Amino acid sequence: MKKKNLLAISSGANINFQKLGFIVERSEIGENREKILSIKIPEIAGSFLKLAKMFANNQITEFNYRKSNSKDAFVLVGVRTKNEKSFIALKQKLKKSGFSFTDFTKNEISNDHLRHMVGGRNNEQLGSNERIFRGEFPEKPGALLSFLENFGSKRHISLFHYRNLGSAFAKILIGIEDQEKDKSLLIKHLDKSGTSFNEETSNKAYKDFLK
């Protein structure tokens, strides 16, 4: 090539898909797009669904819960907000509805560790009545709330883990107290929720760390 003005550009980055996921997750918090809240709820039927309804107009990125022995439990909630003003409005809404909460958005332990550790073993009251299911549903606004509404509040949820990873489908892990003699009734109930599930009660990972 002659009589041409050329510009050489050297570009590159020491990055892979694993690091890219970390960058995306931390940039959501750094740019104030994602907020992390620890919210206290009473351990009574219907309180889990009531909390989910508080976020009907927001995109939930995370929803983690484990039933405890005490009268109250804590739910770790991740939520995307348009701006700081909308986040303030959301906090006011929670307060008016009687929810006590703590903002963990800038808490390093929460961001680096806690969000991956919420869980623990079931309490003695659950015993062998807890059943674990793994499922997924299309990732779209309102999908999580829709599932919880279809599931209802007559059956007690003992464990719940949901994390929005930006894929086409959202994956959830749910623990349910089942005291029915006919164990097929719970399967039929889940089928009506519009979400496909696989039972994981015998999964060794569950037995070793969550049961």
Protein language model regions, located:
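Catalytic phosphate/nucleotide-handling subdomain of diverse soluble enzymes
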Residues: M1-R26
